[in-house]
Amino acid sequence: LAVEAATFHTPYLIENYSDYGDFCKNRLLSAFAFNGEDFVKAQKIRQTIRSKWNHFLKDFDLLVTHSQPEKTPLLDKPSSTRFMNSFNILGWPAISIPMGKDKDALPLGIQLVAKPWQEELLLRAAQTIESYS
């Protein structure tokens, strides 16, 4: 995904480099270290992962996970995307929704994940859960 994101953002990075935060710039720029062969290998690995997840979740409509691996990140500190990356790679629709607050009154969230082309189910479930929190 990094190569795809960097390819998309290249013209904007050139014209508006200072508009990007350091975290985002570093992430996008690191993607330029990959070549075409790396990209093709990554696509093959992506397809293998997709097949395994499709098999693993064949009997489930939705998956519920944490949104973050730790407490709510501060605004000036980027958070980990560890729990989101897998589903971005798969191309599966996912949404993070608020789910109460921690002991410091900071918001907590959960991530809902649906199978491909199940965005309507995902959004209905998210709306229902959010209406109770």
PLM feature spans:
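Short, hinge-like loop/turn segments at secondary-structure boundaries
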Residues: 1-4, 113-114
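Generic recognition of stable, solvent-exposed alpha-helical segments in well-folded globular domains
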Residues: 4, 82, 121-124
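Serine-dependent amide/ester hydrolase catalytic core
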Residues: 6-90
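Structural helix-boundary/capping segments
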Residues: 34-44, 51, 89-133
